[in-house]
Amino acid sequence: MGRFISVSFGLLVVFLSLSGTGADFDCPSDWVSYDQHCYKAFNDLKNWTDAEKFCTEQNKGSHLVSLHSSEEEDFVVNLASQSLQYPVAWIGLGNMWKECRSEWSDGGNVKYKALAEESYCLLINTHKKGWRSMTCNNMAHVICKF
């Protein structure tokens, strides 16, 4: 009896070590999981607005990818560089000037429409780590996350 319990306990330990913490995150088969979120890079080229809409149609709670750490950015860059034809993809920061409140050094409000006619959104470059701005109407790949 003692040997049975010992073997059973040993098998339980092996099972738990192979299965991780028990908090694994299940993603659809064509999505990749990282830190309890699911990601997918699409080769479709879309402007920022259409890319965000596209992501929301892919899965419940899905949006353009948001990046909350350097490690997450590394993961996304690696995923994108393996999947995408071109090295740029939209991230979930769009129309940067829309909600910004800024003022000149003399206290006057900045009128962004005088600065640029087009809105600027952010994308990630898979060849160079970091975010870049580009007009939201340009085309780039799509990376979704939920």
Curated annotation (Swiss-Prot):
Disulphides: C27-C38, C55-C144, C121-C136
Compartments it resides in: Secreted
Positions annotated as glycosylated: N47
One Gene Ontology cellular component annotation held by this UniProt entry: extracellular region
Quaternary state and interactors: Heterotrimer; disulfide-linked. The heterotrimer consists of 1 heavy chain (a metalloproteinase) and 2 light chains: LC1 and LC2.
GO molecular function: metal ion binding; toxin activity
Protein name: Snaclec coagulation factor X-activating enzyme light chain 1
C-type lectin domain span: 34-145
Keywords (A to Z) from UniProt: Blood coagulation cascade activating toxin, Calcium, Disulfide bond, Glycoprotein, Hemostasis impairing toxin, Metal-binding, Secreted, Signal, Toxin
Tissue distribution: Expressed by the venom gland.
Further facts: Calcium is required for ligand binding.
Cross-referenced SMART domains: CLECT
Protein family according to the UniProt entry: Belongs to the snaclec family.
